[in-house]
Amino acid sequence: MSQSVLHPRGLCGNELKLLAILAMTVDHIAWSLFPGYSMHPLALLMHAIGRLTCPIMCYFITEGYHYTKSFQKYALRLFLLAIVSHFAYQFFSFGGHVGWRIFLPFAYGNVLNQTSVIWALLGGLLMLRVNDLDCSALQKTALILLLCLVTLPADWSCIAPLCILSIGANRENPGAQLRWCLFYVSLYVAVYCLSLNVWYGLLQLCVFLSVPLLRLYDGTRGRSAALDRVMKPLFYAYYPLHLFILGLLRAFL
């Protein structure tokens, strides 16, 4: 996953992001067609495909952090997207039946999966910033633990931010990236198995199917500047928009 192993004829950033969008859509359609922890083979297959999304998202947060000209603008865009996506996520999760409690954290009686993965991605971006601060290791650790707490209610919880930190902090060491991500995802799998569903917990290990795809990353954003200008707003708009549409379908079908 490091820049030192770029594939000369691989996939550009836009292509990988489109794959992530496709996998995410398949996953969310599965939640709509097969509510709960369905053991239907098609549901399991669709959810397995969906596990490709989060690692690709995490990886490109680290790329965005590395290449951005303005961290503040990048963080603000993610923050605004996280706010919009929260309501789309709740609307989708509750089949269009949401009330005023949508504005209250943990109002639905659960700590996990209370808001979208965008909040977790923002937390990961902030962890990368903390890691580069000129302060003591103790201060960095305290700030990172605080961000873990803040991102706990998000989809993928604090695991996605910690994976982002691991990838960004080991940019030239793909072995370390993989080891740390395996460690954090294993923790997530254990918690999922113990608190939610064993089979769906084990299903989270399918995130590592994304590794061969990320190894094909050629280090470029896209094939043309004109297409890049179209793709950037698309990537930001698609997440909340598709959740809202699926929420409408769940509400009326």
What residue ranges belong to the model's regions?
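Alpha-helical transmembrane segments and their immediate juxtamembrane cytosolic regions
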Residues: 1-253
